[in-house]
């Protein structure tokens, strides 16, 4: 049975290649092709002999080469590309490439589906099927990086904001981020990495203890207990007041500002009173607020508030000296909400 090479450390790669009959120095060459040049086929590694390539192809697989793109959507401005990737076991996740003036970001999933049950999210419609491995998280990045290297560019930022709760797959997520930080991979700064959580406090505490300057984003979406429970059942186990306290400990240890994400849902959590409640909880905190007008999710029945309502909410926060912005629209014309592309594909397969 062939062994998977993608996502291994250089030492692990050396051990496998030597055991297969290759010279030890070949591991460094393969490593460079995989993680610096984003080549995911052995026969494209031009400084390897035909005999070495034959050994590699006979004994090993490369995960990115096995991924199947089930669906792909590109925004009209060509700045956002969203794909539904199928893994060899038949499970699929969404991942997104976003082109910015300042670089190229990839939004990755950490689980197949999600168990958090957030009312506004399509990712949890079928629950969490399984965690992704670190290699599967990395493969999402390298699928897009292989496209960018042909343009002389590379992925410069990663946000763990796709399907799944990253803090419930902590080791794999951190393993993938640490891998990308290595000098012989993408050498990505931790300051260009963001983990978004719905508020799993033990995970926030573990991240604090690591002491890495990774950006932390908290999915808040309501600052009133009953409403947050309605929107995010996780609030029953981890009340948002305690989540904010854990986030402040993270700030104190790392010096990094925490971002609070707040999806504005028409008639639900978008009133001036809701804005005042949010400001009361975040005042004097080392925090910023990212307001996100809701992407309509047909399965949930939620709608986007008007521009006037969004601006009124923003003004309340600014009045209280809260650093707040409205997320720039980059993919309104595609299935942008988390889980929508996967849910749409699943529905098509049933019809």
Regions found by a protein language model. Give the residues of each.
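Auxiliary Fe-S-binding modules of radical SAM enzymes
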Residues: 1-91, 248-256, 262-351
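Exposed loop/turn and edge beta-strand positions of beta-sandwich/beta-sheet ligand-binding modules
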Residues: 13, 79, 104, 154-157
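Short linear Ser/Thr-Pro motifs
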Residues: 75, 109-110, 123, 196, ...
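Conserved AdoMet/S-adenosylmethionine-binding subsite of the radical SAM
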Residues: 145-320, 324
């Amino acid at each position: 049975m062939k062994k998977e090479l993608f996502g291994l450390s250089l030492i692990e790669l050396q051990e496998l290649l030597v055991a297969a009959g290759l010279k030890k120095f070949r591991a460094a060459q393969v490593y460079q092709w995989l993680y610096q040049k984003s080549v995911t086929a052995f026969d494209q590694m031009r400084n390897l002999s035909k005999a070495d390539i034959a050994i590699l192809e006979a004994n090993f697989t490369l995960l990115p080469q096995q991924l199947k793109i089930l669906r792909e959507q590109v925004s009209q401005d060509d700045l956002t590309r969203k794909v539904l990737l199928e893994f060899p076991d038949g499970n699929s996740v969404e991942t997104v490439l976003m082109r910015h003036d300042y670089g190229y970001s990839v939004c990755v999933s950490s689980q197949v589906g999600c168990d958090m049950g957030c009312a506004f999210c399509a990712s949890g419609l079928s629950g969490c099927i399984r965690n992704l491995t670190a290699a599967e998280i990395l493969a999402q990045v390298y699928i897009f990086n292989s496209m960018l290297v042909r343009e002389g560019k590379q992925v410069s930022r990663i946000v763990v904001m796709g399907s799944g709760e990253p803090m419930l797959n902590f080791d794999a997520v951190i393993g993938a981020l640490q891998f990308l930080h290595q000098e012989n991979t993408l050498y990505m700064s931790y300051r260009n990495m963001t983990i978004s959580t719905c508020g799993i406090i033990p995970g926030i505490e573990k991240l604090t203890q690591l002491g890495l300057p990774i950006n932390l984003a908290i999915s808040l979406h309501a600052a009133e207990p009953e409403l947050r429970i309605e929107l995010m059942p996780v609030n029953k186990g981890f009340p948002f007041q305690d989540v904010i306290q854990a986030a402040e400990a993270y700030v104190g240890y790392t010096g990094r500002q925490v971002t609070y994400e707040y999806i504005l849902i028409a008639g639900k959590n978008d009133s001036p009173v809701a804005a005042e409640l949010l400001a009361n909880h975040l005042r004097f905190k080392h925090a910023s607020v990212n307001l996100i007008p809701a992407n309509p999710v047909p399965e949930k029945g939620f709608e986007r508030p008007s521009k006037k309502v969004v601006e009124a909410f923003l003004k309340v926060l600014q009045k209280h000296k809260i650093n707040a912005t409205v997320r720039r629209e980059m993919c309104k014309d595609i299935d942008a909400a988390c889980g929508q592309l996967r849910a749409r594909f699943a529905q098509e397969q049933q019809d």
